[in-house]
């Protein structure tokens, strides 16, 4: 009997997710690529794991009615899909330690003060990468508009926004 290797499971899951709703086709892949560019100076093993988590970070959306709201740049109170994604990450994947990153990927920076520093940082990176992908995919506006929208320290960590800006200058993230 041949078993499916763990590295193939993420590919199978992401391809399956892409068939369910066309608005999220390859969204996880683009968020992962944006995160990788933002985290260029972090340990490669951690970046790899975070990118795998990013591929499936919105898995919980397929279980909710939030899909129409999460594809907009401005998201308000879209927690349900994050909770389902968190539970999936914690219980079904080898990324249990990153489950809170998925849980908080729509949380404002000011709400994360009690969390571990690393969780806060990676959740903000995923949040900003997620918002950037929605902006690039669904809004036909200049990149400067994105940076203006992200210029809100209560919601977005300025150091994380600076990472996005540098990555975008280096790589033209809109083209991902």
Can you annotate each of these PLM segments?
Residues 48-54, 95-128, 133-141, 146-176:
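Histidine/acidic-rich helix-loop-helix segments that form or flank divalent-metal centers
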Residues 1-96, 107, 113-119, 137, ...:
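Acidic/His-rich, divalent-metal-binding segments that scaffold phosphate/diphosphate chemistry
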């Amino acid at each position: 009997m041949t078993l499916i290797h763990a590295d193939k499971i993420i590919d199978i899951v992401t391809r399956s997710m892409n068939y369910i709703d066309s608005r999220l086709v390859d969204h996880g892949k683009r968020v992962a690529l944006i995160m990788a560019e933002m985290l260029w100076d972090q340990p490669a093993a951690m970046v790899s794991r975070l990118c795998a988590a990013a591929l499936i970070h919105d898995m919980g959306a397929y279980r909710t009615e939030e899909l129409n709201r999460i594809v907009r740049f401005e998201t308000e109170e879209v927690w349900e899909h994050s909770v389902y994604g968190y539970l999936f990450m914690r219980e079904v994947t080898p990324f249990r330690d990153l489950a809170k990153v998925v849980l908080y990927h729509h949380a404002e920076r000011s709400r994360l003060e009690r969390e571990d520093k690393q969780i806060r940082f990676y959740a903000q990176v995923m949040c900003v990468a997620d918002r950037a992908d929605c902006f690039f995919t669904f809004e036909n506006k200049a990149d400067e508009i994105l940076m203006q929208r992200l210029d809100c320290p209560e919601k977005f960590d300025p150091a994380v926004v600076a990472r996005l800006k540098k990555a975008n200058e280096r790589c033209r993230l809109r083209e991902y």
